[in-house]
């Protein structure tokens, strides 16, 4: 999972920010329980601050600082994906029409499959958000929701972590 630019100075003005934060927390908890890869990006952290502390994983994640809007232009990030043999990016964060869109479009061009968590991304302006979603899906990105992707990752109720996963969803 790729969490893009959830920094305090940016998120203040995001539409539906409380819901976005709540869903990213659910995703983080599920990803940590299921021991899935977590990557975090920060756009110009010296000016925009760092990732909101409550949205940092407990352990086992990689953080990338960037100046380009697209994380997919950062060689260090691309090397990490290659080393971990990751070809499907699950994306959440802000802002849909800037850093998310540029990262997604560049990733699709590089051959990655991209899934957008529609209820865990946002922009300041809903028109920008909606148009960016349309552009990314027309380019090949897949839309899903927080709950859907969590159950997709879990795969079965027989999995030992299922009860914990169900509890995350029910919160």
Language model segments and positions:
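N-terminal nucleotide-binding beta1-loop-alpha1 segment
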Residues: 1-6
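Short acidic, Gly/Ser-rich segments with clustered Asp/Glu that frequently serve as metal-coordination loops
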Residues: 8-13
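Active-site-adjacent betaalpha module
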Residues: 33, 46-171
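A short alpha/beta connector and helix-capping loop motif
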Residues: 14-40, 45
């Amino acid at each position: 999972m790729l969490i893009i630019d959830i920094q305090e100075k940016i998120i203040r003005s995001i539409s539906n920010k409380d819901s976005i934060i709540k869903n990213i927390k659910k995703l983080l908890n599920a990803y940590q329980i299921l021991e899935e890869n977590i990557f975090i990006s920060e756009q110009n952290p010296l000016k925009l601050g760092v990732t909101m502390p409550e949205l940092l994983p407990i352990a086992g994640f990689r953080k990338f600082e960037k100046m380009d809007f697209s994380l997919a232009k950062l060689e260090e990030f691309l090397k990490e994906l290659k080393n971990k043999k990751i070809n499907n990016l699950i994306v959440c964060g802000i802002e849909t029409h800037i850093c998310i869109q540029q990262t997604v479009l560049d990733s699709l061009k590089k051959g990655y499959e991209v899934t957008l968590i529609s209820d865990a991304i946002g922009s300041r302006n809903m028109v920008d958000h909606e148009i960016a979603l349309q552009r990314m899906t027309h380019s090949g990105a897949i839309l899903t929701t927080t709950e859907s992707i969590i159950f997709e990752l879990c795969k079965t109720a027989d999995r030992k972590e299922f009860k914990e996963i169900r509890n995350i969803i029910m919160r």
